[in-house]
């Protein structure tokens, strides 16, 4: 979803039509993130006071030069409902993907880095890292109540404040690797760091034994072989724990993310990352970018899904914008 409204419409569409939707928040099916969530929720580091979540840079205005549209591309259809006249074709926006002949994109589509077409790293990696923070502190389906952009009154980083007082800051969590995407939970009795293929804690005895090998690893993307081995080991441990009648925890899963989705299509149960989870995380990312573009704090009521009396924020395109014909947004009433 590019806007808050699109996320809200997706929730209604899924629930009204009794569908099963799994959001691509695959970190929720990753053992290291599940362990971090459990440690936070079980009080391993005490009361959570702040969260550092490094995701990357926000979007910038479209800066790619206009180029001729290839004859085999319907660029008008590719744009969909976007109505910004400044959007023009450049091959980096939509790298070619083809099944016949087979061709995979050689770079990430640059549409995600520009504010006319995407939400930058704020949503690209924020959809993953902010999502884990939301899960750990019990804010699924909800979110922060105030967003303050970087640079406002001299602030060094953008911040998000929850009603319970917890403040999440988009800033580096590793001093020696400031660009590494990941999360650091800081409590009144220690800290937990987690990223893809990495986990650490101020008290390392809290880290499950099957993850001890990740303590010394620097944040990176795990190989498919490592991921497969980790799941096999974890699934065996989970099976053994169930035989003993132990509770595996709210965020544990005995299957990878896509298998979890397939299983839920069959069972009609909610998957590990249902549509409401994706909506609340997307809303958080959009609100951070709205505050950044307005250059001031923005207050949000996650219960009423409104900006209160802030008409400027409510009229921002990242909340809702008028689609161009023939597109419309069902299931959403402005």
Regions found by a protein language model. Give the residues of each.
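Structural motif
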Residues: 40-43, 70
């Amino acid at each position: 979803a590019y806007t808050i409204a699109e996320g809200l419409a997706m929730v209604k569409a899924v629930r009204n039509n009794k569908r099963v939707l799994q959001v691509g928040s695959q970190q929720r099916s990753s053992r290291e993130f599940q362990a971090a969530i459990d440690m936070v929720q079980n009080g391993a580091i005490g009361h959570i006071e702040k969260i550092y979540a490094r995701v990357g840079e926000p979007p910038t205005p479209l800066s790619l030069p206009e180029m001729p549209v290839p004859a085999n591309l319907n660029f008008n259809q590719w744009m969909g409902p976007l109505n910004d006249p400044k959007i023009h074709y450049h091959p980096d926006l939509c790298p070619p993907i083809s099944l016949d002949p087979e061709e995979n994109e050689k770079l990430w589509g640059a549409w995600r880095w520009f504010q006319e077409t995407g939400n930058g790293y704020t949503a690209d990696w924020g959809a993953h890292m902010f999502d884990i923070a939301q899960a750990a502190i019990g804010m699924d389906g909800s979110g922060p109540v105030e967003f303050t952009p970087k640079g406002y009154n001299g602030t060094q980083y953008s911040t998000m404040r929850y009603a319970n007082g917890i403040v999440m800051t988009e800033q580096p969590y590793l001093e020696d690797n400031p660009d590494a995407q990941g999360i650091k939970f800081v409590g009144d009795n220690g800290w937990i760091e987690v990223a893809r293929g990495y986990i650490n804690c101020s008290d390392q005895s809290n880290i499950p034994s099957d993850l001890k090998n990740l303590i010394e690893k620097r944040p990176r993307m795990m190989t498919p072989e490592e991921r497969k081995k980790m799941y096999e080991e974890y699934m065996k441990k989970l099976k053994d724990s169930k035989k003993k009648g132990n509770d595996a925890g709210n965020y544990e899963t005995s299957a990878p993310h896509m298998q979890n989705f397939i299983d839920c299509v069959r069972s009609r149960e909610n998957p590990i990352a249902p549509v409401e989870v994706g909506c609340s995380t997307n809303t958080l990312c959009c609100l951070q970018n709205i505050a950044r573009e307005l250059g001031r704090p923005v207050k949000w009521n996650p219960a009423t899904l409104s900006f209160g009396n802030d008409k400027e924020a409510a009229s921002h395109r990242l909340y809702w914008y008028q689609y161009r014909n023939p597109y419309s947004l069902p299931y959403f009433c402005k």
